[in-house]
């Protein structure tokens, strides 16, 4: 069973009513919700003007203390037994699914230079899906051995293989860079590069960068989602904790960065324009 926590804080009123509020004790309301065979324990902690005392919830929360589904606005003490659930696996799937869908729309994939930025080597199984559309693929990773088997398989089935390297400079001329995990270090790219990643980058990048994804939540799950939670975060919990792996096939309908939002159609139009600009610059040089 998954556990979600909502905090409702009531400010103490003034005067006599405020005295009454002082006598009111914090309380927890628990509701068990069900969707598609999955159960969610939704705890609403009601606080009357005090700092929440989450230790009172230990028995209610049970074994889920270190993976509580909640808003990032809820802050647990560093030495607390309570930890907010965080996992990027589902968001990585959204990133790669959109990239593959975008490539499937292109009629110029044979000329595309594609980069995969995967320092931890966690996304090696993604390689064959990319090479289905282009044979000019460069993987930048600190764990090249993680890509050995997939490269061998691609060579057997497609007669081509990717370039696997630790050198980020090799990404400079890529038209599309796919980074399924949050980018923490800068790497080489150019102004005509489209970069799809997971979470807002922590480093300066050149190009068009998109990192937040939007989609319609499957029927049923939307009814059990706490209102204050973002859809992507809640589905991440369903995927990783609730083993709802079918969510991993979702293709986003929109994506955004810090200043712009794109539909899949407008993203493709922008990608096509970037590619043409890149080709024009190459011809001029």
Language-model-derived ranges and their functions:
Residues 75-79, 123-125, 144-151, 184-187, ...:
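Short, charged/polar "capping" segments at the starts of alpha-helices
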Residues 106-170:
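Glycine-rich phosphate/diphosphate-binding loop of Rossmann-like nucleotide-binding domains
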Residues 26-30, 45-58, 152-173, 182-186:
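A short, well-structured beta->alpha microelement
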Residues 15-23, 78-83, 128-130, 148-158:
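Short, aromatic/basic amphipathic alpha-helical patches
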Residues 83-101:
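A glycine-rich, Thr/Ser-enriched phosphate-binding loop motif common to dinucleotide/cofactor-binding enzymes
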Residues 8-17, 22-78, 100, 271-285:
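Metallocofactor- and cofactor-centric catalytic cores in central/energy metabolism, strongly enriched
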